[in-house]
A protein has these predicted regions:
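Single conserved hydrophobic/aromatic residue that forms the stacking wall/gate
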Residues: 1-8, 12
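C-terminal transmembrane helical hairpin of 12-TM major facilitator-type secondary transporters
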Residues: 147-196
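Pair of pore-lining "gating" transmembrane helices in MFS-fold secondary transporters
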Residues: 73-94, 183
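C-terminal membrane-cytosol helix-exit motif in multi-pass small-molecule transporters
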Residues: 30-50, 259-264
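Short amphipathic helix-loop junctions that connect adjacent transmembrane helices
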Residues: 96-119
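A late C-terminal transmembrane helix in Major Facilitator Superfamily
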Residues: 207-238
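Juxtamembrane intracellular "pre-TM" segments in multi-pass secondary transporters
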Residues: 48-80, 279-285
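Helix-to-loop junctions at the C-terminal end of transmembrane segments
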Residues: 132-151, 236-237
Length: 285
């Protein structure tokens, strides 16, 4: 009976092999995205005609240069860039290492989870927790407004790194406890990430070319994840494993807290940004 039960629980990888399993999963994802693309092509509104067109390549380049200059001339843009980058800096360190930590055997400082368990905890319970956290984070900001909610949001966003440090040091054998830590991570990520998104929308993007400037801010947030992710593997090996790596990740959260405590707000977070406030925001323009 145990053999039959195990056979039924086999994942795609066990049935067809690793390479073929990846091919099947990627093909299914590609087909799903293709169908969604056709659906959106037919159902979404066109958005109307563009209000302005570049007459030449030179004009397009000048407009692009004006967009970049406008972004870097915004008031407090230096501290805003630092805040956006460091908001997710610790996440960038941890996000590449956590799957390895969960899958590594106990004698290698890991938790010894199977791929099936990791997929279930992340792909099902984690996604649900992320959606719930995002919704509650939005209500939390609406209640307190962004200025007052920002520091609590960063705190909640970074608490999961404490959880992973504890998991690394104590290596609990309970799947329920480990799953709870992963669910809490995704809930906190959804709850806290709303604050960064709204900060970029309210304080960085307003003004001429606000869609482009919002894209710049979002790119900086992704840069704050990519850069530490590039060194996370080397850092984990250099520190001697997961124990000290997650402790180091906790130290990496400090700049975000320091910046959040003193971050200036260019625009009020209680009402729509007025046109005259946008004009005052730009320096030397």
């Amino acid at each position: 009976h145990k053999a039959i039960r195990r056979q039924r629980q086999m994942c795609i990888r066990d049935r067809v092999g690793i390479v073929e399993a990846w091919m099947i999963v990627m093909a299914l994802c590609g087909a799903l995205l293709f169908l969604l693309g056709i659906y959106h092509l037919r159902m979404l509104p066109s958005g109307g005609e563009a209000t302005a067109h570049a007459g030449s390549v030179g004009e397009a380049l000048r407009e692009t240069g004006a967009i970049f200059r406008g972004f870097f001339r915004k008031r407090y843009i230096g501290i805003y860039i630092a805040f956006i980058v460091f908001y997710r800096f610790a996440e960038g360190l941890v996000i590449k290492i956590v799957p390895l930590f969960l899958n590594a055997p106990l004698d290698n400082q890991g938790l010894g989870l199977t791929e099936q368990q990791i997929g279930l905890y992340y792909g099902t319970f984690g996604v649900i927790a992320f959606v719930v956290g995002s919704i509650l984070g939005g209500y939390f900001i609406a209640w307190l407004k962004l200025r007052r909610a920002l520091f609590p949001l960063i705190t909640i966003f970074n608490i999961p790194f404490v959880v992973y440090a504890l998991l690394a040091w104590f290596q609990p054998a309970s799947p329920l406890l480990i799953c709870g830590g992963i669910v809490f991570e995704y809930f906190s990520y959804g709850f806290g990430f709303v604050g960064l998104t709204l900060f970029i929308m309210q304080q960085v993007a307003p003004g001429p070319h606000q869609m482009a400037h919002y894209a710049f801010g979002s790119s900086l947030a992704n840069l704050g994840v990519m850069l530490p992710g590039m060194i996370s593997g080397w850092l984990c090996d250099s520190l001697g494993g997961y124990h000290y790596f997650f402790m180091w990740a906790l130290l990496a959260t400090v700049p975000a807290f320091l910046l959040a405590a003193r971050i200036p707000f260019t625009h009020p977070d209680t009402e729509e940004v007025a046109a005259e406030e946008i004009d005052k925001e730009l320096i030397n323009e």
